[in-house]
Amino acid sequence: MWLPKIRELIEAIKAIIKGPYTSKFPNQGHTPHPNFRGQPKFNEEKCVGCGGCKEVCPVEAIDYLDINDKLNPRRVITHYTDTCIFCGQCEAACIADCEGIKLSNDWELSFFDRNKANEQIEKELQLCEICNEVIACRDHLNWIIGRLGELSFSNPTLYLTRLKSLGIVDENIRSALAHQGCSDRSDRVKILCARCRRETTLTTTGTSKL
């Protein structure tokens, strides 16, 4: 009958000598294991704005909004921490070598204001030079160019995007028939969406004298 009490006394003496078994949080910060899956965080420099993370998120914790402004077209990508389940699918699906968004070791995620739980980044959009529709983020186009290499020169949208990033494209180039509200075949050498690319390829406007 006394044996259990003796064991308790032995454990109490060990605790006095060696210290408590529990962690000293919150007096001392906790360092999680390196493989701990904490809050995902965007890397604005690595992210290309493709939206792949949004497509694979099982709880729709990632969303984006395209702001089609001619002066400052941009894509606002938002991660909702309060909805996230930290599954890691966004990191696994990232086309930028899984560097655009990564799980961190941040685990203490208490907020008094729910809006502060959201993380946002902005990526510059590339618009069609005729209809101003969204084509993709410029970083995404540059990523595609890097993957295709010299094959990208078969696509005017890609190689003109590359030349524009190098600062050697004249921004003042306009269609010779722009005042007539139509597209000319010369517009093929522009950054265009798929619909305008088709129209400028199939149009016969301005070619009757050839």
What residue ranges belong to the model's regions?
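Phosphate/diphosphate ligand-binding glycine-rich loop within oxidoreductases
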Residues: 75
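Non-ligating segments of multi-cofactor redox enzymes
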Residues: 1-68, 72, 81-83, 89-92, ...
